[in-house]
Design a protein with these regions (language model features):
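Jelly-roll (double-stranded beta-helix
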Residues: 1-272
Length: 272
C-alpha cells in the first residue's frame, strides 16, 4: 500500500524485472488493480512528498484522483484521464482520492509510471500536464480503438509532451478481435493487461499481468479472448547511468546527495 489510498503491485524495477534499465526510459510501474474502497469522510492517498529527476504519470481506469504540487498546479482526473507531472529540478506533490469519490466510495483502479528524464533535462523547470480522455489521439480499427496518450501511431500523435522518444497507449479490443502493432525494434516494450485476457504472439496473458518483450522484432499481434484493455509502453532506452534513492532518480550519488540537501533546505517549494 502506498499511503492509505493506493493498493499497488510493483511490476518493475522489482518483481522479476530487477534490471533498472530493462524498460528504460520507463523506470517504475505501480499498478493499483481494481479494489473497492468504502465511503470515507477522510480523503485517502499520499501526503506531501518530494521528487526530482523524472516524471510521474498517473493513468485513471476507475475512480478519481486529485493532485496538488508546490509549483502551483492542481487538478482532478477520472476514468480514462492522465496526469503527467514533470518533477525535473524538484517539486513537492500530494495525491488523494477526489473528495466526492472518497465520500461515496467505489472501485479504484490506477497505474502510476515513473518516466526517467535524460540527464540534460533532469534539472529543467517542473511542469504539469492534465490530459483528458477526449483529447487523446485515436486510431479506430475494425476490432477496437487505440488511444495515443504519448508518442504516435500511424502519424496520429498523442497530446503528452515528452523529453525522449516514447509511446504510451491504451488499447481497447473487442471480443475475438485482434491488432498487429508496429513498434520500433530498438524500443523497450511492455504491456499490462488492465481488463480481460488476451493472447500476445500466441501466449495467453490474463488481466493484471505484465508482458515484457525482447528487442527482436517490430510487429506484435494481440488478440482478445473477451473485451480487453491493455496499457502499451514502448520507449527508446536512455542508456545513461541510473542512481535511485527514495523519491529521487538521478545519474550519480553526488546528484542524489545534492537532491537530499536541496530538499532539506526547502528548495523544492512549499505545499501544505
Amino acid at each position: 500500500m502506498v499511503g492509505d489510498g493506493f493498493r499497488v503491485h510493483n511490476f518493475f524495477p522489482a518483481a522479476g524485472i530487477q534490471n533498472k534499465q530493462r524498460m528504460s526510459p520507463f523506470f517504475m510501474l505501480d499498478y493499483a488493480s481494481p479494489y473497492h474502497f468504502p465511503p470515507s469522510e477522510t480523503q485517502r492517498g499520499v501526503d506531501v512528498h518530494p521528487h526530482r529527476g523524472f516524471e510521474t504519470v498517473t493513468i485513471a481506469y476507475q475512480g478519481k484522483v486529485a493532485h496538488h504540487d508546490s509549483a502551483g498546479n492542481h487538478g482532478v482526473i477520472g476514468e480514462g484521464d492522465v496526469q503527467w507531472m514533470t518533477a525535473a529540478s524538484g517539486v513537492l506533490h500530494k495525491e488523494y482520492h477526489e473528495k466526492d469519490f472518497s465520500q461515496k466510495g467505489g472501485t479504484f483502479q490506477m497505474v502510476q509510471l515513473w518516466v526517467n528524464l535524460p540527464a540534460q533535462y533532469k534539472m529543467t523547470t517542473p511542469r504539469y500536464q492534465e490530459i483528458k480522455k477526449e483529447k487523446m489521439g485515436q486510431h479506430a480499427f475494425e476490432g477496437g480503438m487505440l488511444e495515443i496518450i504519448a508518442g504516435e501511431y500511424r502519424e496520429i500523435k498523442g497530446p503528452a509532451q515528452t523529453f525522449s522518444p516514447l509511446n504510451v497507449y491504451n488499447l481497447h479490443l473487442n471480443p475475438s478481435k485482434e491488432i498487429t502493432l508496429e513498434l520500433p525494434a530498438e524500443f523497450n516494450t511492455g504491456m499490462l493487461v488492465i481488463k480481460g485476457s488476451v493472447t500476445i504472439e500466441d501466449q495467453l496473458v490474463s488481466a493484471d499481468h505484465f508482458a515484457l518483450f525482447q528487442n527482436n522484432g517490430t510487429s506484435i499481434t494481440i488478440k482478445a479472448k473477451e473485451s480487453a484493455t491493455l496499457l502499451v509502453l514502448s520507449g527508446q532506452p536512455l542508456n545513461e547511468p541510473i542512481v535511485a534513492y527514495g523519491p529521487f532518480l538521478m545519474n550519480s550519488w553526488e546528484e542524489i546527495e545534492q537532491a537530499v540537501e536541496d530538499f532539506n533546505n526547502g528548495k523544492f517549494g512549499v505545499l501544505d
